[in-house]
Every structure is written in C-alpha cells, then in structure tokens.
C-alpha cells in the first residue's frame, strides 16, 4: 500500500508480526529538502537538488515556491530549480503550507520581505490550532505588519512589509526552533544586517544547524555566539546558485530503526546519514538497549533485533523527531523509560505527549507525563490490541503506533494512515516488503462503530 493511491485507505490494519528481513531505501529528509527547495527558489539562476523528499512537506514547499515565481523540473533523482529575485515580487501571494509547520514558519520569514501575503490551511484542527505567536511577535519588532487569529496568532495570517526592516529582533524558541530558522531566511534575503537574540533556549539546535548549513552552502554566512543564542546575518551576502544533496529523514529513519529493533529482524537500510539524528544519540540509544547495528560501506547500516529490550532514559532534545518512535519501542522494554526535555514536541502536528498517551492507553500501554516528559512503563509480554487508534494527523504518531500494533495479539486499526505521507509516503509499502503484516482498508462506518 502506498499513499499515492487515488483512493486513500480510511484505516491501516496492523497485525502481529514475528520477523522482518530485507532491505529498505530510506526516504530523504523533509527538513533538508524544504530548506534546499526554498534556498534554491530564492536564488536567481539555476540550482540543483539531488534526492529531494517526496512527502507532503516537500511538495507543499515546492508548490508555494512556485507561487513566488520559481520553477521546478526533474532529471532522474535531481530536481532543477530556476529561482526568483524576491526584490521583484510586488504582488499579493497566498501561501498554503498544508499541515507543515516548518513550511509555514520558513515562508513567514520570507514573507517579512514581501509586500502582501496571506497564509491559509485546510488543516484547521492541526496546523490551524498551533500557535505562531512567537514568530508574529518577532516579525512585528522588525516593522512587519501581521494580522492573526487570537492571542496565539493562529492561521489565517496576513502580512505586509515595506521592506524597511529593523536591524534587531528577539524570539522565543522554547516551543520550536523553526521560528528562528524562518528569521534567518528573512535576514538572508534582506538588504540590511539582522541580529536575532533567542530569549530562552533552542529546543532543537540540530535543526537550526541544518538551516545554517543550508544557507552557507548557498553563500550566506550566519554568525552566532558560543552560547548559540545570538545570531547575525549580514545583509551584503546573496544567494548563489548551488548543488544540494539531501540525506535521510530523521523521523522516518528513527521509525524504521525502532521498528526493526523491536522485533526479530535482519534488515539493511540504504541511504543512512546521521546529521539529523542527534549526532549518534539515536543509534547509541538503540544499541545500548539491545539492538545490534553495524555500519556498512556506501551509507548503509545493518540492523538486527530480537533480543530483550532494556529500559533506558533518553534526552529528547538531542533528536526530537525520534521520540515517538523510540517511545513506541520502549513499550516492550523490561522496566520504565523516561523521555525528557521534550516539552516542544507538544507543539508539533499533534501534542506528541498527551495525544500519544491517549492512544497508548487504548492499547494497554502504561504511561505517565509531565510538562516536558513522557514516561513509558514497558511490558515485554506484549499487549492485547484489538483497538482503533487515532494518528492525530501526525506521521510520527502513526509510525510509532504501527510498531506497537505489530506486537499485539489482535489487529490494531489506525485511522487516516495517509498522513504518514507528511514525511514518508511509502512507509507501509516499505515495511510490508520486509515482512510487516499491514493492510490498507476502507471501512466508512468503522470509526463510528468502534472508536
């Protein structure tokens, strides 16, 4: 089953699976892809991007960059981008980021230099309820006019700019580092130098480094202090046509690693890169808790699971996108695992702590939560299953719930599984190819009957 089917399954049925074996080509990173697409679109001339992700996030960024005036074509695994000079954009633009927070916030940064923009979404119960107050406040300090819904500055959002921006702003990154990344893009396209102060702490510094590295690749040098709290973007720098190569997606990679590490498995993963996986933190966590992982030539790894899983705590700030996947695997550990420093994952496509716990409870997984912690009480003897669970429009939760469902005695139905396509459209096809027992189903009345 793939999410490219014309008729999307209403549910995926996940059934007990004993072993996994085979090979998977890991999907490309949504974080690197969205940034590379935007950078190339903002660069007058021709840039190329190899291995662009095919998920909803990347497609949303591409469609919105086309609204800016950029154009895209494909040559094999390479995307050719003809960029645009935003100084020549003088019309109203309506951006639709879909359900992607990173697309929204990066484009809000760019919109700070556009005369008239509006942001809308059809995902009013997901992205539509997420706060953009930190970004709006930072833009207003730079003399950008912003109108949004309520004190949380929710969508729809309208922005107007005279391009006479201030030289300094500050932003809170407690909920998301994406606000800072958007402001870095604004500084990169502006005529004047821009200083940005982070007033608290950055929840996912690795993602900010991804932004900085992407901009540097195109010739824009972002400076920052030793504390990684003060940032300077020189107005004299300009984007230069570049060649980008995108590595593996961290959330998707973590999901496959956790899945294979939870069952008896012997699986090879192609296209493995660690740049967004906490600089080895995820691999160390998996090996420390019982999974065998060997590095192979050519950016490949071999993963072998089946041993008992040991409970262990994990600092989620090192790899935020990996937390749901690792927590799903921890449900089968002998003992209690605490995932900490993770308040910011409450503000993703879903509340990845409270929403996740609601679904874990349906499956019989014992858990607790604090503001910045998810505590999983493992049970190596598996769970009964036989429940309908909700993925909450969230690819991370859908993949984590799938891992748990493969261990359950009775089938588990996951609602609206196509949202996994946010980062990994072929997730169910890929895990099916290595032996996972999953089937897409269309049951129009099941939700009312069993939810």
Swiss-Prot record:
Residues annotated to bind 3-phosphoshikimate: 30-31, 35, 176-178, 321, 348
Subunit structure: Monomer.
Gene Ontology biological process terms in this record: amino acid biosynthetic process; aromatic amino acid family biosynthetic process; chorismate biosynthetic process
Catalytic activity, as annotated: 3-phosphoshikimate + phosphoenolpyruvate = 5-O-(1-carboxyvinyl)-3-phosphoshikimate + phosphate
Membership in a protein family: Belongs to the EPSP synthase family.
EC number: 2.5.1.19
PROSITE patterns: EPSP_SYNTHASE_2 (PS00885)
UniProt-listed Gene3D superfamilies: Enolpyruvate transferase domain
Pfam families in the record: EPSP_synthase
Places the protein is found: Cytoplasm
UniProt-annotated catalytic positions: 321
GO molecular function, one term: 3-phosphoshikimate 1-carboxyvinyltransferase activity
Species of provenance: Burkholderia pseudomallei (strain K96243)
Cited function: Catalyzes the transfer of the enolpyruvyl moiety of phosphoenolpyruvate (PEP) to the 5-hydroxyl of shikimate-3-phosphate (S3P) to produce enolpyruvyl shikimate-3-phosphate and inorganic phosphate.
Gene that this polypeptide is encoded by: aroA
Protein name: 3-phosphoshikimate 1-carboxyvinyltransferase
Binding site for phosphoenolpyruvate: 30, 101, 130, 178, 352, 422
Pathway noted in the entry: Metabolic intermediate biosynthesis; chorismate biosynthesis; chorismate from D-erythrose 4-phosphate and phosphoenolpyruvate: step 6/7
Entry keywords, A to Z: Amino-acid biosynthesis, Aromatic amino acid biosynthesis, Cytoplasm, Transferase
InterPro entries given in the database record: Enolpyruvate_Tfrase_dom, Enolpyruvate_Tfrase_sf, EPSP_synthase, EPSP_synthase_CS, RNA3'P_cycl/enolpyr_Trfase_a/b
GO cellular component: cytoplasm
């Amino acid at each position: 089953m793939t999410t490219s089917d014309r008729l999307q399954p209403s549910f995926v049925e996940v059934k007990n699976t004993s072993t996994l074996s085979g090979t998977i080509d890991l999907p490309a990173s949504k974080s690197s892809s969205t940034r590379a697409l935007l950078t190339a679109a903002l660069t007058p001339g021709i840039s190329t991007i190899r291995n662009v992700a095919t998920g909803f996030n990347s497609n949303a960024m591409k469609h919105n960059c086309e609204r800016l005036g950029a154009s895209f074509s494909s040559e094999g695994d390479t995307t050719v981008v003809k960029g645009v000079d935003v100084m020549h954009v003088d019309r109203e633009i309506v951006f639709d980021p879909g359900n992607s927070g990173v697309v929204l916030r990066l484009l809000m940064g760019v919109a700070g230099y556009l005369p008239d923009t509006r942001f809308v979404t059809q995902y009013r119960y997901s992205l539509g309820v997420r706060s953009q107050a930190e970004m709006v406040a930072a833009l207003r300090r730079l003399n950008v006019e912003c109108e949004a819904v309520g004190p949380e500055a929710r969508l729809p959002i309208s922005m107007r700019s005279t391009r006479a921006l201030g030289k300094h702003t500050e932003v809170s990154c407690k909920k998301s580092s994406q606000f800072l990344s958007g402001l870095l893009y604004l500084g990169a396209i502006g005529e004047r130098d821009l200083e940005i102060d982070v007033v608290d702490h950055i929840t996912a510094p690795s993602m900010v480094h991804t932004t900085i590295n992407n901009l540097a690749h195109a010739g824009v040098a972002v400076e920052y202090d030793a504390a990684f709290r003060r940032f300077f973007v020189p107005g004299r720098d300009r984007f230069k046509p570049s060649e980008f190569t995108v590595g593996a997606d961290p959330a998707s990679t973590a999901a496959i690693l956790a899945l294979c590490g939870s069952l008896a498995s012997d699986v090879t993963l192609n296209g493995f890169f660690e740049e967004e996986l906490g600089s080895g933190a995820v691999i160390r966590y998996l090996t420390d808790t019982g999974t065998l992982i060997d590095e192979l030539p050519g950016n490949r790894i071999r993963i072998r699971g089946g041993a008992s899983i040991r409970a262990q705590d994990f600092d989620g700030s090192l790899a935020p996108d990996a937390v749901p996947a690792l927590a799903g695997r921890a449900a089968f550990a002998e003992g209690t695992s605490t995932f900490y420093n993770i308040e910011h994952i409450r503000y993703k496509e879903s509340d990845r702590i409270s929403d996740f716990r609601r679904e874990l409870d349906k499956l019989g997984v014992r858990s607790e939560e604090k503001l910045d912690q998810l505590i999983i009480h493992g049970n190596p003897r598996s769970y009964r299953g036989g429940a309908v669970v909700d993925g909450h429009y969230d690819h991370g939760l859908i993949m984590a719930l799938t891992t748990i469902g493969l261990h359950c005695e009775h089938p588990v139905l996951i609602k609206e599984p196509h949202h996994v396509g946010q980062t990994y459209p072929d997730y169910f096809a890929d895990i099916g190819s290595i032996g996972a027992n999953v089937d897409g189903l269309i049951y129009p009345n099941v939700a009312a009957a069993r939810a």
